[in-house]
Amino acid sequence: IPLRLVGSEMCIRDSIEKIHAAMDDYAQNVLTRAVDGFIYVERTEQSGKVRQGLVGMVDLEAYSYRRGEKCTVRPSESTVESRIPPRMKVRTGATLETPHIMMLADDPQCTLIEPIAARKNELRKVYEGELMLGGGHVAGWAVEDPALIAQIENALTVLGSQEEFDKKYPDATRRDPLTLAVGDGNHSLATAKACWEELKKTLTPEQAENHPARWCLAEVCNVHSPAIEIEPIHRVLFNVDCATVLLSLITWSDANMAGCCFGGNKKQPFTLAGPH
């Protein structure tokens, strides 16, 4: 996203008009190659790893940032709702859809993105270039063939099925299926949802069915991709009793089936370092 389309959260009021003006300029003079479908994206990092993704539209009717609501597209973290209104001011009246949102698909069999990657030489390349500040290289190809689009949609349907969910997550506390999880940009997607909910109040059911604001731009990546590295977030606790903390963590983990403490099937062991 060009820096002219980015605003600081601290001084967003001062930059809204400039952002909207820059969007108008880009819409008229830069973004002239339309794609009727998806865009297959490859980002080559400095390490040589290639992150593959599909850029498309997320149906906001299938997403909610409110805890407990049934939806097939869900956030991976709690949403701080106070961060939504400033973003709504930028999105309201914007002529371009330019959020940075990464969705994650739990696709160990590589049925969604990788088959498209294997056929990229058949696709029309729509952009390519170097990214700033050592960000690597990026290229995008248009996925417009109806057969390939149907293939993507079918893969998403299977990934979001109840059968697939039950097979992957037999110990999950909530049983409604999950198609995509928000990996990054949760508050941007939440803002799109909030804007859509406000706008939908002014529309007839027929208008709401196909209104452009119902969808939000996002990139979908496979969480099993070798280029997706999920780093731990370390926490330091001061002036606590190590044994008490350990017991509390084990109790919480077992009660929530989090699998983050100890036991034969626990997948995320951790270390408590401190005086014993």
Please identify what each model-predicted range represents.
Residues 1-11:
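Single conserved hydrophobic/aromatic residue that forms the stacking wall/gate
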Residues 9, 17, 138-147, 159-167, ...:
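Compositional signal for N-terminal targeting/processing segments
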Residues 14, 114-116, 228-233:
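Short conserved micro-motifs at the rims of enzyme active sites and ligand-binding pockets
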Residues 22-181:
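Short alpha-helix boundary/capping and kink motifs at helix termini
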Residues 85-89, 203-204, 255-259, 266:
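Glycine-rich, charged/polar anion/phosphate-binding loops
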Residues 99, 214-216, 268:
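Residues that flank catalytic or metal-binding motifs in active/ligand-binding sites
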Residues 184-251:
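Catalytic or ion-translocation cores adjacent to nucleophile or general acid/base/metal-coordination motifs
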Residues 237-276:
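C-terminal catalytic or substrate-handling cores of phosphate/nucleotide-
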